[in-house]
Amino acid sequence: MPKRGKKGAVAEDGDELRTEPEAKKSKTAAKKNDKEAAGEGPALYEDPPDQKTSPSGKPATLKICSWNVDGLRAWIKKKGLDWVKEEAPDILCLQETKCSENKLPAELQELPGLSHQYWSAPSDKEGYSGVGLLSRQCPLKVSYGIGEEEHDQEGRVIVAEFDSFVLVTAYVPNAGRGLVRLEYRQRWDEAFRKFLKGLASRKPLVLCGDLNVAHEEIDLRNPKGNKKNAGFTPQERQGFGELLQAVPLADSFRHLYPNTPYAYTFWTYMMNARSKNVGWRLDYFLLSHSLLPALCDSKIRSKALGSDHCPITLYLAL
């Protein structure tokens, strides 16, 4: 996602953390909760222990990770690959790679087991957008884009078909500073929804990536200040809701953790937003409803550094 505060006009709470004298703590305990709800104080998210069995007790057999890396080369320099090696996913999906295929860093070949690698990037915009999909298992079929020329120029979608499901990784367009691309985003949302509905009619679907929208108020720290900003406009939120209903798909994280607050995947580099957890949940694993019995866990790895987004991980028992 473009840098909010540098490239995007997204309101974030810039107040510094306040410390209180011991004598005042008892008097201000109630106020602290109010401040946290308003995005004015520390309210951190702790990723719970991984659940590696399905509701019926089947052990997880597939682990997928997704990460907006905000530039492959910079991410590698920040030790992003070290985290991937430790996490050891079966499939790794990357967004905002900002790298054409002929300039991919050699270090990517060092990833153990992820030898089947697929990349998409704009042909005429070096250093912009781009997605990647790396897998232990060779997919049955791989395709790029959503089949519409207007939407397939920026390297935003890879589709990989496996035996029991289809995986789509996407870097959804940002509505931009001043919402200059909001109309385009709405056209994208409609076309993407139709495309996914067609895929899901043939085989269960997993959609992952930076979907560039915080669906509900619980999904960002400062909802009141962002209702007219990219990523939280009524139009984008409605488009996301229509996607869930029409395809149909389930938000795996909210399916398991419907009321968990402060669970974000993106923080602007500005104003110490990450240390204060002033963030947005923009990255998702969405699943066909037929896959919900196989859902073991949907994780937000908020402590993993290397980008302005953190990685997310999905466990399925297929």
Swiss-Prot record:
Residues 289-318 are annotated as: Mitochondrial targeting sequence (MTS). One of its GO terms (molecular function) is double-stranded DNA 3'-5' DNA exonuclease activity. Residues 1-33 are annotated as: Necessary for interaction with YBX1, binding to RNA, association together with NPM1 to rRNA, endoribonuclease activity on abasic RNA and localization in the nucleoli. GO terms for biological process: base-excision repair; cell redox homeostasis; DNA catabolic process; DNA recombination; DNA repair; positive regulation of gene expression via chromosomal CpG island demethylation; positive regulation of transcription by RNA polymerase II; regulation of apoptotic process. The specific activity of the cleaved mitochondrial endodeoxyribonuclease appears to be about 3-fold higher than of the full-length form. Extract of mitochondria, but not of nuclei or cytosol, cleaves recombinant APEX1 to generate a mitochondrial APEX1-sized product. The modification Phosphoserine is found at S54. Residues 1-60 are annotated as: Disordered. Mg(2+) 2 binds at D210, N212. A motif (Nuclear localization signal (NLS)) lies at residues 8-13. SUPFAM superfamilies: DNase I-like. The modification S-nitrosocysteine is found at C65, C93, C310. The record marks H309 as: Interaction with DNA substrate. The record marks K31, K32 as: Cleavage. It is found in: Nucleus; Nucleus, Nucleolus; Nucleus speckle; Endoplasmic reticulum. Pfam families: Exo_endo_phos. A motif (Nuclear export signal (NES)) lies at residues 64-80. It catalyses: a deoxyribonucleotide-2'-deoxyribose-5'-monophosphate-DNA + H2O = a 5'-end 2'-deoxyribose-5'-monophosphate-DNA + a 3'-end 2'-deoxyribonucleotide-DNA + H(+); Exonucleolytic cleavage in the 3'- to 5'-direction to yield nucleoside 5'-phosphates; a 3'-end 2'-deoxyribonucleotide-3'-phosphoglycolate-DNA + H2O = 2-phosphoglycolate + a 3'-end 2'-deoxyribonucleotide-DNA + H(+); a 3'-end 2'-deoxyribonucleotide-8-oxoguanine-DNA + H2O = 8-oxo-dGMP + a 3'-end 2'-deoxyribonucleotide-DNA + H(+). This is DNA repair nuclease/redox regulator APEX1. The record marks N212 as: Transition state stabilizer. Phosphorylated. Phosphorylation by kinase PKC or casein kinase CK2 results in enhanced redox activity that stimulates binding of the FOS/JUN AP-1 complex to its cognate binding site. AP-endodeoxyribonuclease activity is not affected by CK2-mediated phosphorylation. Phosphorylation of Thr-233 by CDK5 in response to MPP(+)/MPTP (1-methyl-4-phenylpyridinium) reduces AP-endodeoxyribonuclease activity resulting in accumulation of DNA damage and contributing to neuronal death. The gene is APEX1. Its EC number is 3.1.11.2, 3.1.21.-. The modification N6-acetyllysine is found at K6, K7, K27, K31, K32, K35, K197.
